[in-house]
Curated annotation (Swiss-Prot):
Gene3D superfamilies listed in its UniProt record: 3.30.70.120, Periplasmic binding protein-like II
Protein name: ATP phosphoribosyltransferase
Catalytic reaction equation(s): 1-(5-phospho-beta-D-ribosyl)-ATP + diphosphate = 5-phospho-alpha-D-ribose 1-diphosphate + ATP
Cofactors that this protein relies on: Mg(2+)
Species assigned in the record: Xanthomonas euvesicatoria pv. vesicatoria (strain 85-10)
One MF term in the entry's GO annotations: ATP phosphoribosyltransferase activity
Family per similarity comment: Belongs to the ATP phosphoribosyltransferase family. Long subfamily.
Name of the coding gene: hisG
UniProt cross-references to InterPro entries, sorted A to Z: ATP-PRT_HisG_long (IPR020621), ATP_PRibTrfase_cat (IPR013820), ATP_PRibTrfase_CS (IPR018198), ATP_PRibTrfase_HisG (IPR001348), HisG_C (IPR013115), N-reg_PII/ATP_PRibTrfase_C (IPR015867)
Activity modulation: Feedback inhibited by histidine.
Length: 304
């Protein structure tokens, strides 16, 4: 089916995620936190949704954008780098991407970077002229080089990019970097950022108009609630009115303070949702500023 062909009407939503790899478990955990559960098929590639009519396809990450573009899946959780690589390749072939990043999902952060041999004295992108650059992301790299006005040769490799300079097949590389340990092990150093990346929820540009539309809206609302609460805690305490302004200044990453019904002790009963780390040091600062009876609670679910 081509990207321009309308997908047949379905009453079940399909989501593609990695079968294995660094995004597989976080993606499945995120969807489970949204209330989804599945029954796995014998081939372990298809998971039938039991709690809701939302099925999973377990595939290679580089298959996910195409499955969305062709209407086989409605959504996918995939690295932004993979999504953009295939979109750039489609643009170069005169095809619409037919998919887009709906929202980031808070994991899988990495950077696509140029890395050169450690002995290089790096002065800037002008040094790339005439060089051979090995990468698994040729379309992204070609677009980036074009924007920089650099004429260099892109050497496409499907794996083991980091050994290309030692093998003599390239002068430098463009590859994903998380910790930098792999680069260091191959006597390479990162020198230039090409793209920031993270895992994203990708979806078709044309949203479904059948029974899936309601499922999609519900899933996105649940996911927003899960993502908002991922690093959030409910903070409850008592305080005198004269201390409220000082306490509010100590909570710049929190929602507005909510006053609860009086418990008869004279002080105000307050609560707020904190969206950053609530450390012991932070609680002690609040206590010194007048907060009493501090409690930090984990919140599992929320509908905004």
């Amino acid at each position: 089916m081509s990207a321009s062909t309308a997908a047949p009407a379905r009453d079940r939503l399909r989501i593609a995620i990695q079968k294995s790899g660094r995004l597989a478990e976080p993606a499945r955990s995120l969807l489970a936190a949204c209330g989804l559960s599945w029954r796995q098929s014998r081939d372990k590639l298809f998971c039938y949704g039991e709690s809701l009519p939302v099925d999973l396809l377990l595939v290679r990450d580089d298959d996910i954008p195409g499955l969305i573009a062709d209407g086989v899946c409605d959504l996918g959780i995939v690295g932004q780098n993979e999504l953009e690589e295939q979109a750039a390749e489609r643009r170069r072939n005169g095809l619409p991407a037919a998919y887009h990043a709906v929202r980031g999902v808070g994991f899988g952060q990495c950077r696509l970077m140029l890395a050169v041999p450690e002995e290089w004295d790096w002065h800037g992108v002008g040094q790339l002229a005439g060089k051979r650059i090995a990468t698994s992301y040729p379309a992204i790299l070609a677009d980036w080089l074009e924007r920089q006005g650099i004429d260099a040769t892109v050497v496409e490799l499907s794996g083991s990019v980091e050994i290309a300079p030692r093998l003599g097949t390239a002068d430098l590389i463009c590859d994903l970097v998380s910790s930098g340990a792999t680069l260091a092990a191959n006597q390479l150093k990162p020198v230039e950022l090409v793209m920031e990346s993270e895992a994203v929820l990708a979806g078709a540009v044309r949203e479904p108009a059948d029974a899936r539309a309601g499922l999609l809206a519900m899933l996105l609302r649940r996911m927003d609630g899960v993502l908002k609460l991922r690093d959030s805690k409910l903070l409850m305490f008592r305080a005198e009115q004269t201390n409220v302004d000082a306490l509010r200044r100590l909570l710049p990453d929190a929602d507005p303070l909510v006053q609860l019904p009086d418990d008869g002790n004279g002080a105000l009963r307050l609560q707020t949702m904190c969206h950053g780390a609530v450390t012991w040091q932070r609680l002690e600062e609040l206590e010194r500023a007048g907060a009493q009876g501090l409690m930090v609670l984990t919140v599992e679910r929320s509908l905004a």
